[in-house]
Amino acid sequence: MKESVAPSRDLTITALDYSSLAGWDDEGHGAAFRAFRRGASVLSRHPPKSHSVDAVALATILKRANALPADLPDNHARAFFEAEFAPYEIVSDGGTGFFTGYYEPIVAGSRIRTDRFATPLYRVPDDLVAFDPASPPPGLDPALRFARQTDKGPVAYFDRDEIEAGALAGRGLELVFVADPVDAFFMHIQGAARIDLAEGGTMRVSYAAKSGHAYTPIGRVLIEMGALEAGKATMDAIRQWLAANPDTAAVVMRQNRSFIFFREAPVENPQLGPIAAAKVPLADGRSLAVDRLLHTFHCPVWVETSLPDGKSFRRLMIAQDTGSAIVGPARGDIFFGSGAAAGTIAGSMASKGRFVLLAPRGSRPNVNPQR
C-alpha cells in the first residue's frame, strides 16, 4: 500500500506497508520496545503533546506497553509495534530525510579548581530569565529566548567571550572543572557529559539553559578561514585543528557566542545516557532527536540511512530528544552512546535517508512545517 496523504507545498506524507521497510523483519524490536516503554514512566508528569501524532492515542499505547514485560522478545515486540502503529514516510522539500549524530562525552574533572582542572562548567545564574519568543521584551532581539534581568529590565545576556573573560567570576556558579577548554566547548555542543572525578566517583552534567545567543558552527568558521576543506569539517577534524593551534583555538571557539549552563544529574544507570528532553534516559542507537515543534516525543521512527563507514543503518528508534539545530519534518539526530568511540561516529555522521514515522493506528500524522 502506498497512499499519499496530507500533501502540502513542502511536504509529502505517504502511508506504507511494513514490507516496504528494508530490514524491518531482522530488526531488534525488543531493544526498541524497551526504549519506547520507558516513556510510560513519565506519562503522569510529562504527558506527550500532540504535534505529528495523536498524543492521547500514543499515551494509551504507552500504558499498554507498560503492562507488558520489559524484556519482550523481538518477535513479540515486532508484533506489538505492527499492531499498534502504521508507518508513514515523511518527505520534505522534495528530498529525503537527513541524519546527524550526537553523543555523551566522558572526561576527567574535579569539583575543585586545581592547576590541572581549571576550565569551569557553570550552573544557571540567578539573573538569567527565559521568555516566550512570540512576545519578547521591548528592545531585545526577537530571536532571543533568554536574557539578563537588571533593575532597568531585561538585556542580552553575557556571551561566550564575556563569560570566558570573567563576567561570572566570583558568583560561585562553577559546577565542575575540566582540564581542556576544547573538551568544555564540545560539552556545550553536546549538551551533556559524564565526568570521572579526580576525588572519586562519577557525575553527570546536562543542559539546563543557555545565554540565548545564536549558535555558530565553528566548522563553518574554520572553512571560511581556509583552515579546513568544505565537506571535511568533521568533529574529529575540528578537534585536531584546535589542539594543533592552541593560540588561535580560543579566538575561533568564541565565534560561537552561545554559552550553555548545566545542572548536575544522577548517574542512575551507566548503561544508559543522560536524561533527554522527553524526560527519559537516552538509549544508545535507539534515541532520536527530532524537531520538537513538529513531532511528538515517544513516537517511534523507522530510520534508514548509512553510517560514516558506509555501512547501512536500519533501526527502529524513538523520538526522545531535540536540539536547536534539529529543524524540519524529516530531520533526525541519532544518539550513539557515551565516550570517545561514540563521539568518532557521531562527529562524522551526516547522511541522507528515509524518515518513517509510526503513527497510532486509526489516526493520521499531522506534520506542519509552516511555523
Where on the chain are the PLM-derived regions?
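C-terminal soluble interaction/assembly domains
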Residues: 2-7, 14, 25, 31, ...
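Secretory/export targeting leaders with adjacent low-complexity proregions
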Residues: 12-266
